[in-house]
C-alpha cells in the first residue's frame, strides 16, 4: 500500500499475467491475514491466513509430503511421494476450498499449493526443497512459457 503497487498488481492479474507467491507471498494472495492483527491482503484467492491450532511445534519447520488433490500440471516429473520444506506459523483457511491444489499434513491438512487461473502460491519454499522444488519451479516456467 505504501508504494501504491496494489492497483498495478491487480491490473496485471486482471490482464492475465501469471502471478506467483512463495511463503508470505502466498499468504498475501488471500483476503485477510491475522498474523499480529487483522490485515487486508490482495484478495486474488478466497480465504484467510490464520494461526495453527495444533499441539505440534509452531513454527512448522521441516519436510512434509505434498498430497495433490487431483491431477495437475505441477506434478509433471515429480516423484510419487514429493517432499518439500516448510517454515511458517500461519496457514490458509479453509483447507478444503477448490483453490487448494495440494496439502501437507501437520496435525491437520495444511494448504501447501493454492491457485486458480493465472495466480499460484506455494506455502513451502521450493528454493529450499531440493530436486522436488527445482522441478516445481521448472514446471511453472514451462507453464508460463506455454501460455505466453
Predicted features along the sequence, with ranges:
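Cysteine-nucleophile active-site neighborhood
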Residues: 1-63
